[in-house]
Amino acid sequence: MLIVGLTGGIATGKSTVSKLLQEKYHLPIIDADILARKAVEPGTRAFNRILSTFGEDLALHDEKTGKVIGFDRPALGRRVFGDEVARKKLNRIVHPAVRWLMVKAVMWEWLVMGRGLVVLDIPLLFESGLDQFCGISVVVATGEEVQLQRLLERDKHLSEQDARGRIASQWGINEKRKLADVVIENDSTREELEKRVDQVVQKYFVRSRLWTWMLRMPPVGLLFALFIFIRRRLTRKRRDKVS
């Protein structure tokens, strides 16, 4: 199976590309944001650990039945904001749960649905290290000023200072460009973006004889996957040394 990791920066158009791949090309999309919400639903181990770690008072209850229906996300955000230790604790609770759901989703598409390709839509693909498990990593990118203007147009309540702060809170788009196998530039019109997406689909997803051949020979596919994993690990180590 070819696992494609799709990412980008805030307001660069990743969601637009993800929607195109799903609706126009009928490719299965596994959305990390959806899985992240599912991973902390009431009754899950991650949900219970969040309450026991950060406070039972975070629980939200149904007014009529008193049943726990979730937790106060803004309040949790305030408790971990600016506290690196607390943030790491939260990540250690949530990230493994999300990864497990992601593995199950990939296995479902492969073994049950018989898919030969799946797209992982992950905002923090490189930051989380999940790119190491992808056959191809794709970044949707724009120039920094275009990114800023689109964010201000999308979230009109933000000041320019706040918008720049949100962009700065993530890895820079140029840094992601360097790590990606494929870069889709989204600095023009919607029509131009669709053309670029089509070129990527035709080149990497449809016409890739290598992946088609490997799907028919699982041992070779596993060896190639191991090669990709090691290559990405070495690339990440070199990057960490430079930074």
State the predicted function of each range:
Residues 12:
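ATP-binding Walker
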Residues 37-116:
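ATP-dependent small-molecule kinase phosphotransfer cores
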Residues 100-153:
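ATP-dependent NMP and nucleoside kinases share a basic, alpha-helical "lid"
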Residues 102, 132, 154-234:
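Small-molecule kinase domains that catalyze NTP-dependent phosphoryl transfer to phosphate-bearing small molecules
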